[in-house]
Amino acid sequence: MLQKLRKRQRELEEKQYPDELYGFEAEIYEFFMLVAGSLDYVLANKRIPRHQRRSLEKSFFELYPDILPDMIKNDKDLYHHILLYEQVRQEICVALSN
């Protein structure tokens, strides 16, 4: 599992952020940092703070209910970027539950 997460970490580091963020840059960057930071904790075998872990258990759209999926689905680059971070978030949650 850790090997898969290390591969995901490289994937996140290599992928550039989307050009257009539609006025909710803060929320998007906060989510990306939550996932990337949590991944760093897991790979370093460190304990994730409780409040961070609770946030990590929620999807992007659960954390930011004012941002509707329809608002970003038309921008394939942004949508796929969020989906990538969602997949990594879910994989981290699986690793933490083991």
UniProtKB/Swiss-Prot annotation:
<protein>
    <recommendedName>
        <fullName>Uncharacterized protein YxiJ</fullName>
    </recommendedName>
</protein>
<dbReference type="Pfam" id="PF14176">
    <property type="entry name" value="YxiJ"/>
</dbReference>
<dbReference type="InterPro" id="IPR025551">
    <property type="entry name" value="WapI/YxiJ-like"/>
</dbReference>
